[in-house]
C-alpha cells in the first residue's frame, strides 16, 4: 500500500522496540508520580489510541509514529505487570505467578507472527492493530476495578536530558545498523 523499501519497513518494528525501552524507563517515574492504577490506565488508554491511529493511518510516517507511541506505552505496561504481581501475590505464590506471566511473554512473540499472517491474509495488515483492542479494554476494566493504587509521597525527578539522549542514541544506533554499508 505504501510502496516501501526494506530499509523503511523495519522502522515499524524497530521504532516500537526502541520506544519500548524508553517506556520502561518512564514507568517507575509515572507510577511514583501518578500512582500505579492511574499510570497503568493512562498507558493503556494511550496504547489503545495509538492502535486505532495505526490501524487507520494513511501515511507511513503516521504508521511509524503510532508504533512508536505503542512502544512507549507497552514499555510502561510490561514492567507494571511485574510490579502488580509482586504487590498482589503473597511471597509463596509469586514464583508461580511470575512463571505464568513469563509464559505469556515468551509465547506472545512466538504466536504473534503466525496470527498476524493469518489476519493479513484474511483481512488486511490494519487488522493487526485492531485485534488487541478487546483485550486492552478488558484489561482497563479489570485494572480500574482491582489494581491497587500505590503512590509514593515524593515522586522522583525524571532525568529528561538523560531520557532524550538515550532516545537519540538508540535511534542513531538503529539508523546506522539499518543503513549498513550504503
Predicted regions and their residues:
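Hydrophobic transmembrane-helix bundles of small-molecule transporters
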Residues: 121-182
Amino acid at each position: 500500500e505504501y510502496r516501501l523499501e526494506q530499509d523503511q519497513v523495519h522502522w515499524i518494528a524497530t521504532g516500537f522496540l526502541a520506544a519500548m525501552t524508553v517506556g520502561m524507563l518512564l514507568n517507575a517515574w509515572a507510577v511514583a508520580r501518578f500512582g500505579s492504577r492511574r499510570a497503568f490506565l493512562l498507558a493503556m488508554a494511550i496504547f489503545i489510541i495509538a492502535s486505532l491511529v495505526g490501524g487507520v493511518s494513511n501515511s507511513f510516517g503516521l504508521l511509524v509514529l503510532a508504533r512508536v507511541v505503542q512502544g512507549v506505552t507497552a514499555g510502561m505496561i510490561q514492567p507494571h505487570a511485574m510490579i502488580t504481581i509482586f504487590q498482589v501475590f503473597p511471597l509463596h505464590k509469586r514464583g508461580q505467578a511470575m512463571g505464568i506471566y513469563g509464559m505469556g511473554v515468551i509465547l506472545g512473540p512466538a504466536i504473534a507472527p503466525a496470527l498476524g499472517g493469518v489476519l493479513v491474509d484474511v483481512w488486511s495488515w490494519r487488522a493487526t492493530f485492531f485485534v488487541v483492542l478487546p483485550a486492552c479494554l478488558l484489561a482497563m476494566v479489570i485494572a480500574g476495578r482491582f489494581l491497587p493504587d500505590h503512590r509514593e509521597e515524593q515522586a522522583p525527578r525524571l532525568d529528561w536530558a538523560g531520557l532524550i539522549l538515550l532516545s537519540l542514541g538508540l535511534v542513531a544506533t538503529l539508523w546506522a545498523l539499518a543503513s549498513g554499508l550504503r
